[in-house]
């Protein structure tokens, strides 16, 4: 991906699809939780790609919080899920768990303006708010919306240490 960036970029939707395919979990049943989560993740990847391509064409795509960053997180999460499944970590081979994890990665810096927060969780909270219509359109239940929000808010650098301590 780094060699392709940005001139031969394959697109974030393709990266999302390949991440899912690497997990070898098949096609979730229509109407299932995993199906809704994948629909959400795909719509996020599509929107981030469109927004990023437009900003890139205008010379305004953020240097760090860009499409390549989202792709990096999708690849890393895919490796973590595959390693967890190999080690037989509870839930790691469940389609809904994997779909949720990939959806979180796709949305964690949704439409990020670049730069740093001026107050705690500023950009993360904005991402959660801006993702609400996509969550509803995908038919995510309240629990999944809350989990997505919780995990996205946890990516604020000032909150990371507290979250690490909480899961010890």
Feature names for model-found ranges:
Residues 73, 97-116, 127, 149-157:
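His-Asp-centered metal-binding catalytic motifs of divalent-metal-dependent phosphohydrolases/nucleases
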Residues 91-92, 136-168:
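Histidine/acidic-rich helix-loop-helix segments that form or flank divalent-metal centers
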């Amino acid at each position: 991906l780094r060699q392709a960036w940005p001139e031969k970029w394959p697109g974030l939707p393709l990266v999302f699809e390949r991440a899912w395919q690497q997990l070898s979990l098949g096609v979730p049943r229509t109407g299932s939780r995993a199906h809704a989560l994948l629909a959400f993740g795909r719509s996020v990847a599509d929107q981030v790609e469109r927004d990023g391509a437009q900003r890139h064409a205008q010379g305004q795509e953020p240097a760090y919080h860009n499409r390549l960053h989202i792709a990096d997180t999708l690849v890393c999460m895919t490796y973590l899920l595959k390693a967890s499944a190999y080690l037989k970590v509870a839930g790691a081979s469940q389609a809904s768990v994997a779909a949720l994890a990939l959806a979180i990665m796709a949305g964690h810096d949704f439409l990020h303006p670049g730069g740093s927060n001026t107050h705690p969780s500023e950009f993360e909270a904005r991402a959660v708010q801006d993702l609400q219509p996509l969550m509803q359109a995908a038919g995510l239940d309240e629990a999944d919306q809350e989990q997505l929000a919780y995990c996205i808010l946890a990516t604020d650098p000032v909150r990371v240490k507290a979250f690490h301590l909480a899961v010890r």
